[in-house]
From Swiss-Prot:
Low complexity bias locations: 61-71, 78-89
Principal subcellular localisation of the protein: secreted
Stretches the record annotates as B domain: 155-243
Tissue expression from the record: Most abundantly expressed in placenta and lung.
Annotated region (A domain), positions in chain: 115-154
Binding site for a carbohydrate: 282-284
The entry's keywords: Calcium, Cell membrane, Collagen, Disulfide bond, Glycoprotein, Immunity, Innate immunity, Lectin, Membrane, Metal-binding, Repeat, Secreted, Signal
Glycan-modified residues: 265, 313
UniProt xrefs under InterPro entries: Collagen (IPR008160), Fibrinogen-like_C (IPR036056), Fibrinogen_a/b/g_C_1 (IPR014716), Fibrinogen_a/b/g_C_dom (IPR002181), Fibrinogen_C-term_domain (IPR050373), Fibrinogen_CS (IPR020837)
Protein name in UniProt: Ficolin-1
Gene3D superfamilies in alphabetical order: Gamma Fibrinogen, chain A, domain 1
GO molecular function: antigen binding; carbohydrate binding; carbohydrate derivative binding; metal ion binding; signaling receptor binding
Length: 326
């Protein structure tokens, strides 16, 4: 109202000047306080009035009390695994554990007290035929097939033919170390046979079964195989008995021959000619490591043959050679 009276007192010219003054002030404050209010004067004239700028903010009020906790949110995804931290300090030593059970005897103890032959196993009460561990003179353990049933038992089997599943036409190295399977046919190895028969006097038994189920055998007073330096020479005692007859004495003192080492007395290689490995002379009366030909065969003397038994044209179903310390 006071402003209106001032404007009337100034007259039209004063009102115009007052209006221009306010316009100038409004332009200067446009950047900070741009709001302009237009008010009416008497008559049709109007006057624009600039609203003042807001004052400075007052001081902050006291902090209000904390609101109630909101509901717990869902668990977030696992973060990336961090690096392993440094090792912690070494813990205290734990208490001493309970004493363990007594273990199996060591090899040295087993060698000192273990069996040397299948016959020794038999005297210790092992009456079942099968594979057993014995210890050679150099303390080497050897798994062997023990025949505890035939002719009083206690025989160590070193050769077995039974089904033709194993190839016996092999080289010197194979016969040296042995080959075959515990489940069927095998040759124990000339080194092992030498070690077994070097312990003392051993008798030899040869058991044969034909494909008609007929059993034959031949038994010798002594049997030994020399070492490799003597080419595994056959050292054989006299023939004792047996319905198979004697077809091994003609091989006495002969060296062992294979397809790759010819040590026989023949101009050719008996091992190659008769497809085997044996103590060939020139050439053989027996060939138990020959081809597995399943009974009668038209080829000559190249099967599992025993001349004084079924002759040179019959290959036995089963052949076993075994020794027993006397």
């Amino acid at each position: 109202m006071e402003l209106s009276r001032v404007a009337v007192a100034l007259g039209p010219t004063g009102q115009l000047l007052l209006f221009l003054s306010f316009q100038t002030l409004a332009a200067q404050a446009a950047d900070t306080c741009p709001e302009v209010k237009v008010v009416g004067l008497e008559g049709s004239d109007k006057l624009s009035i600039l609203r003042g700028c807001p004052g400075l903010p007052g001081a902050a009020g006291p902090k209000g009390e904390a609101g109630a906790n909101g509901p717990k949110g869902e668990r977030g995804s696992p973060g990336v695994v961090g690096k392993a931290g440094p090792a912690g300090p070494k813990g205290d030593r734990g208490e001493k554990g309970a004493r363990g059970e007594k273990g199996e005897p060591g090899q040295l103890q087993s060698c000192a007290t273990g069996p040397r032959t299948c016959k020794e196993l038999l005297t210790r009460g092992h009456f079942l035929s099968g594979w057993h561990t014995i210890y050679l003179p150099d303390c080497q353990p050897l798994t062997v097939l023990c025949d505890m049933d035939t002719d009083g038992g206690g025989w160590t089997v070193f050769q077995r033919r039974s089904d033709g599943s194993v190839d016996f036409y092999r080289d010197w190295a194979a016969y040296k170390r042995g080959f075959g399977s515990q489940l069927g046919e095998f040759w124990l190895g000339n080194d092992h046979i030498h070690a077994l028969t070097a312990q003392g006097t051993s008798e030899l038994r040869v058991d044969l079964v034909d494909f008609e189920g007929n059993h034959q055998f031949a038994k010798y007073r002594s049997f030994q195989v020399a070492g490799e330096a003597e080419k595994y020479k056959l050292v054989l005692g006299g023939f004792l008995e047996g319905n198979a007859g004697d077809s091994l004495s003609s091989h006495r003192d002969q060296f062992f021959s294979t397809k790759d080492q010819d040590n026989d007395n023949h101009s050719g290689n008996c091992a190659e000619q008769y497809h085997g490995a044996w103590w060939y002379n020139a050439c053989h009366s027996s060939n138990l490591n020959g081809r597995y030909l399943r009974g009668l065969h038209t080829s000559y003397a190249n099967g599992v043959n025993w001349r004084s038994g079924r002759g040179y044209n019959y290959s036995y179903q089963v052949s076993e050679m075994k020794v027993r310390l006397t």
